[in-house]
Amino acid sequence: MSATKLTRREQRARAQHFIDTLEGTAFPNSKRIYLTGTHSGVRVPMREIQLSPTLIGGSKEQPQFEENEAIPVYDTSGPYGDPQIAINVQQGLAKLRQPWIDARGDTEELTVRSSDYTKARLADDGLDELRFSGVLTPKRAKAGRRVTQLHYARQGIITPEMEFIAIRENMGRERIRSEVLRHQHPGMSFGARLPENITAEFVRDEVAAGRAIIPANINHPESEPMIIGRNFLVKVNANIGNSAVTSSIEEEVEKLVWSMRWGADTVMDLSTGRYIHETREWILRNSPVPIGTVPIYQALEKVNGIAEDLTWEAFRDTLLEQAEQGVDYFTIHAGVLLRYVPMTAKRLTGIVSRGGSIMAKWCLSHHQENFLYQHFREICEICAAYDVSLSLGDGLRPGSIQDANDEAQFAELHTLGELTKIAWEYDVQVMIEGPGHVPMQMIRRNMTEELEHCHEAPFYTLGPLTTDIAPGYDHFTSGIGASMIGWFGCAMLCYVTPKEHLGLPNKEDVKQGLITYKIAAHAADLAKGHPGAQIRDNAMSKARFEFRWEDQFNLALDPFTARAYHDETLPQESGKVAHFCSMCGPKFCSMKISQEVRDYAATQTIEMGMADMSENFRARGGEIYLRKEEA
């Protein structure tokens, strides 16, 4: 941690410099590759980690080597991970999906924005210097049409997005030939259906059944298609966003790019401060991953932060504003019903969800039912016109392990299941949000309840945190719960940073949270038995046993930290080829001793074999040639 705290001006200047000098960057000894599909324009990016050869014999002068295969890995960094692509944040990213959207012929450009708030912002000349220059002309579905990936899937249509996802989820494992690398332990999937090869038809079928979603607003053509579902790789979400007291547009764009570099599959913009609209436009136009929001936060800003003054009209205007900007999924707290609020009275920590507390306060002040619940069908109509997925928020999630799995939490969950079926009537894609704070022995029930009552819609959880005693380390406490619930079937994990419960995360906190959650997600994939999940582990273990230090660094989730820790004690170049590390030293390295034992055993086997053959030769009379019947 830096001893010098930057001023707000210095923080903004640093972020501006980051944006101005941004270019595509590969991880050490990695290169960007693209796998193509049958649909036009389907080029799926992956990162391929190049490995050094293994020394297998020979002499010092003429060593013999065996090549090691490059390892392809899932890559969320988009154009920012390709050194061949010129990055210009002022112009935004290329519109990858635009030709696919246009080819379907079911959308139309809007000549006038649907949101009054958007119209007012665009008419305000004072915002010109903050505004993203290349504002997208929004589209919506033509009258009587639905443009969601769920609608297409139910019609039996395999979209380019679905083919893109199938290639991406297979992670290029068909390129791996080594049996050592392909070896994998059987998983325990708890009912998940994990095919050996993921096809576009399998993707379509999972989306059609509601077991998976493809967040892909037609107004976010820059996004690279991805999928959230328990029969696919476990995904990780990162939260960013400014507040009334900290962060700027430049810093949020920097955090966006940083999040994707470290593995965020989606990013939620939780901004609550000034210039929410303008910040979101910059984020969307520069994001290759889906962007989610909590619209009630901005709606609250529009009524000066007074929850009692919220109206359906203000909220509806916010939905239209954000849908036409390109937001891919909305968190909607429509399950916080008036009759559930008293259930939280006996809790130790009450209602801890910001969105949940806003809606609870509105319900109590008006003594009326939650207007998000009352107008849920209208919400679905809006989402169906732009293909905005719904993330049904857990406004009554437990905020302490004492409150875990209580009456209020599961009452809301059951209501979310009812709302899921309504959303599906409109071909709107749905995932369900979950807790929270839950001790380990109570985690699995959350998954089984969700599968049963929410009809196997994808589950998306914040952790859960497994203990409440570690402020400053809640990325650890929640990472434990995240790996468990991911194994049980949770489709996406919302990261927790070291600043959870303490403050707004900075750039380094974002990285720490993401690395922790990429570990949790990968551990869950291994435990479920996701095909190919173990390849990278096998490659790392082989490199470790063969003392290929550079390969160990480069195969790591965080190559820079791995190298830095090694170099703290063995900084010399000779340390990169040494057959030991500073933990045990040269004489007590278990790997080195194991190699010596293996070599000794192999030599002994050869010598014993030769002795057996010699004895057999003498027993047969010492004749060089034997008669045919004796041979």
Curated annotation (Swiss-Prot):
Question: Which top-level group of life is the source organism from?
Answer: Bacteria
This entry carries the following GO cellular component terms, namely: cytosol
* The entry's keywords: 4Fe-4S, Iron, Iron-sulfur, Lyase, Metal-binding, S-adenosyl-L-methionine, Thiamine biosynthesis, Zinc
The record's annotation in InterPro entries points to: ThiC, ThiC-associated_dom, ThiC/Bza_core_dom, ThiC/BzaA/B
- GO BP, one annotated term: thiamine diphosphate biosynthetic process
- Binding-site residues for Zn(2+), renumbered to this chain: 437, 501
UniProt cofactor(s): [4Fe-4S] cluster
Which residue pairs form cystines in this protein? none
Residues binding substrate, per UniProt: 239, 268, 297, 333, 353-355, 394-397, 433, 460
Enzyme class, first EC level, given as a word: lyase
- Pathway listed for it? Cofactor biosynthesis; thiamine diphosphate biosynthesis
Question: What are the protein's GO molecular function terms?
Answer: 4 iron, 4 sulfur cluster binding; carbon-carbon lyase activity; zinc ion binding
Q: What does this protein do?
A: Catalyzes the synthesis of the hydroxymethylpyrimidine phosphate (HMP-P) moiety of thiamine from aminoimidazole ribotide (AIR) in a radical S-adenosyl-L-methionine (SAM)-dependent reaction.
Name of the protein described by the UniProt record: Phosphomethylpyrimidine synthase
Q: Which organism is it from?
A: Shigella boydii serotype 18 (strain CDC 3083-94 / BS512)
- State which gene encodes it: thiC
